Amino acid sequence: MDRNSFTAYGPATGAITESGEQENDHTKPHTWKTFAKYACFESEAERQWWNDSGALIARFLSLTNGDIDQQYQCLLFVRQVLIPALGPYPPVRRCCINTTEIGMELSLNFQGPGEPVFRVSIDPVSRMTGTPMDPLNINTVNNMITRLASMGIKGFDRTLHHHFTREFCMSEQSMQSYQRDSGEAIAWSQTILAFDFKGGDVVTKQYIWTRHAARASGLHPHSLIRRAISRVENQMHCSAAVELVLEYMETFNADIPVPFFSWDLVDPTQSRFKIYGISWQWSWAKAEEVCTLGGKLNHHDIDLLKKLWHILKLDEFTPTMGFTWNYEIRPGQPKPEVRLYLAICDRSDEEVAQAVVQWFELLGWHERAQSYPETLRYLHKTKSAHTWLSVTVSEKGVYTSLYYHPLGNGSDDFKIRENWF
């Protein structure tokens, strides 16, 4: 595809182009076009990110059916906060948040037959990133958190950011010696951010990887998690559920300790705490074990998850990515909710769309099922537009998220270049 033009298609639409011209009455030419027409960029890389992923994000936002004011608010946030944090274009720094190793991921969360919620996850980049000044990218994320705090975002709270970075992130001197002694040619970021766009508001989440702190301290990642949670138990009230999860991991998944965890950047008494697990064992038996914590929980509607497993034909082949899941723990909740992440990056978009349609029909989301293949028309026609499908089945309902390649102009064989910061 010509990188000088970007075309994205959506349900019953025309197109958004780099000039902003389109035929879709639903999105109108007022959002992305308005910002693109008179936008001033600090660098050519910012302009290219905006014309590529910025235009793609505009389409995602339009799918959430927010009104025009909400779309403006969200796009302004993307333009002013996210785009400057993406670094060089095309991207040159490897990131482990998705299968493309690009430091951004886009997703849609479907919570029923209504409109989905849009999310962006990013590994922020600055001139310090990956250098001896900030080898694990901690200072860059800290600076972005400071900027977010100054913006007066509704509900934004840095308390848990300060707590968990203090518990898990090393000092600058320790980071430098860690990079030298670890023998790693390049250090991956230790912490990243994600943003949910809901009704014109932005909800921020933070993730921290555990292995750097574990290696530097000589302590097991689970010991560090237990200690960190115990110090905020009077606010988060989640230690019982955390202990339940860690005991399961130590019994059934001991070869791969908790690789990372996340929380909401809100008041600690309202924040969820999520613990992630990874296994290279792709089988329904493993998935059932994960969902029941090795038999300790009676998972709500496990048979429904098994049907999704078969719809995705996960017994017929092994994905190239590991089987991933998380346990979501809410304040005061004695037991976690389980979310499975099923790799679909090895499938064609057509295969994935057919599976999603079948899944949505099974859930009774008939209109959403009928429209999903059409919503994919705006995505570039590659073999890997989709990366993951995640699902939670709880008493409140079924939550399904689909994750996508972040470059609207990306080609099938896009690879991170072998030069680094």
Curated annotation (Swiss-Prot):
GO molecular function: transferase activity, transferring alkyl or aryl (other than methyl) groups
EC number(s) given by UniProt: 2.5.1.-
Binding positions for substrate per the UniProt entry: 119, 272, 274, 276, 341
CDD domains: PT-DMATS_CymD (cd13929)
Enzyme class name: transferase
Signal peptide: none
GO biological process, one term: alkaloid metabolic process
The protein's name in its UniProt record: Prenyltransferase asqH2
Region named Disordered: 1-28
Origin superkingdom: Eukaryota
Keywords: Transferase
Pathway per the UniProt entry: Secondary metabolite biosynthesis; Alkaloid biosynthesis; Mycotoxin biosynthesis
Family: Belongs to the tryptophan dimethylallyltransferase family.
Keyword Chloroplast: no
